[in-house]
């Protein structure tokens, strides 16, 4: 997926998120994130957008400290202005990434072809996952489908970027393997979970695994981001691995 495609996705997903939020009350619970109300979701996503905008705009070479993060986020809006505040922050992020040079030099935290490629990709998927949360809060029976190529790209970011970081919490006393295989894209990943940090092998469709999860890229994307139940995919083998996934895979920033 190219930078321009990630930017198109970021535009689209932010607009869909705002549209869903506008259809319900700020106190509406978010079923996909039970600890949140819609208000929390908008604040979180809007703050992340402003944080990312500041990193790109100011060409920061290291993570912003607490004071810089607070300055980037600005004051929280009141309820009456929250949705407009979200839309403004989303538009500013898209504009900043759109005008950034290809040779942008700034901090990033996952492997990528370039810092610009990283931030366009990360914010597109950040916004897409939270768009699903907003649709959940608005009572949608089904989330808006994501393009298979975009969903597969999101799976790759999650599995080969986030999941393999040394501080990841997904661990097992004995080595166990999970094969993730899409039916509508030629992609698969073999995830090895043990006492050490997770390892992931791409293109591992022929490899044996303790548990194999097969489905559309869209369903796998949301399942592995813990936004859909396991019954949305075909599960073969030791299904308890998916319980282990749900316990250990959520992203932690602390």
What residues fall within each predicted segment?
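Active-site-proximal cofactor/substrate-binding loop regions of enzyme domains
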Residues: 4-73, 81-84, 88-89, 93
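Short, contiguous alpha-helical
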Residues: 25-65, 111-168, 220
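Conserved catalytic-core motifs characterized by acidic clusters
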Residues: 63-69, 104-110, 199
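Hydrophobic alpha-helical segments and helix pairs
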Residues: 81-129
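A glycine-rich beta-turn/hairpin centered on an aromatic-Pro dipeptide
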Residues: 153-193
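Acidic/His-leaning functional-site neighborhoods
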Residues: 180-218
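C-terminal interaction segments
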Residues: 205-254
